[in-house]
Amino acid sequence: MKPTTVSTLRQWKQQGEKFASITAYDFSFARLFADEGIQVMLVGDSLGMVVQGHDSTLPVTLADIVYHTEVVRRGAPAALLLADLPFMSYATPEQTFDSAARLMRAGANMVKLEGGKWLAETVKQLTERAVPVCGHLGLTPQSVNIFGGYKVQGRDAEAADLLLEDALALEAAGMQLLVLECVPVALAKRVTEALSIPVIGIGAGNATDGQILVMHDAFGITGGHIPKFAKNFLAETGDIRAAVRQYVEEVKAGSYPAEQHSFQ
């Protein structure tokens, strides 16, 4: 299979072709996802909650992400593979370069970091050193203690304007992809249309260029609180492969996420 690249995603955006992505943490699921049509995967620090059993992403280490990136890459050699820079792994320029280099050597095509325009210089420096960057705005889980919980972001006009400013500043600094999490549909549409780079949504409505789900949410195996934006595709199909195919098909058709999965 021909490798999926950032250029592929840009072409899809230009053509109005939506795409599905998902988190992956191991070889077998990565291979299954690739077999069923998912070409973009994220080794997310969400593994701290759904794999390791923590109550947040904060305990996840760089070594954790490196390990899971290596095994996911073996399962999906042609996928565009994103890897999270975990909490406090990009606090200084030197630390950032070292962390990013380790993830790229492990098989990542791009590193993802959380934060606004204050990270513009970091994005610029990584890009200049041949490390592609995916940004993450809206609800950024590493900032859960600042937000006071997992809450929808950008609901008032001022917050929405600031988020758009952040997105534009990061794009100008060299960001090549953006994840928007838990923001109102109208704001996600506004950001997606304002940026030339692809935007992936999670809890951001269906106006974004792509969608991403934590795999455990897509299969209904998280237990406890179920996010509003999640849909249990396994419950409807009874088969993991069929569930993945349905997820891909609904994203491409624009039927997922529906209104009940979105914030106004």
From Swiss-Prot:
Annotated catalysed reactions: 3-methyl-2-oxobutanoate + (6R)-5,10-methylene-5,6,7,8-tetrahydrofolate + H2O = 2-dehydropantoate + (6S)-5,6,7,8-tetrahydrofolate
Alphabetical list of Pfam families matching this protein: Pantoate_transf (PF02548)
GO molecular function: 3-methyl-2-oxobutanoate hydroxymethyltransferase activity; magnesium ion binding
Enzyme class label: transferase
Binding site for 3-methyl-2-oxobutanoate: 45-46, 84, 112
Any one biological process term the GO annotation gives: pantothenate biosynthetic process
Source superkingdom: Bacteria
Record-annotated active site: 181
EC number from the UniProt entry: 2.1.2.11
The protein's assembly and partners: Homodecamer; pentamer of dimers.
Protein name stated in the entry: 3-methyl-2-oxobutanoate hydroxymethyltransferase
Organism, as annotated: Erwinia tasmaniensis (strain DSM 17950 / CFBP 7177 / CIP 109463 / NCPPB 4357 / Et1/99)
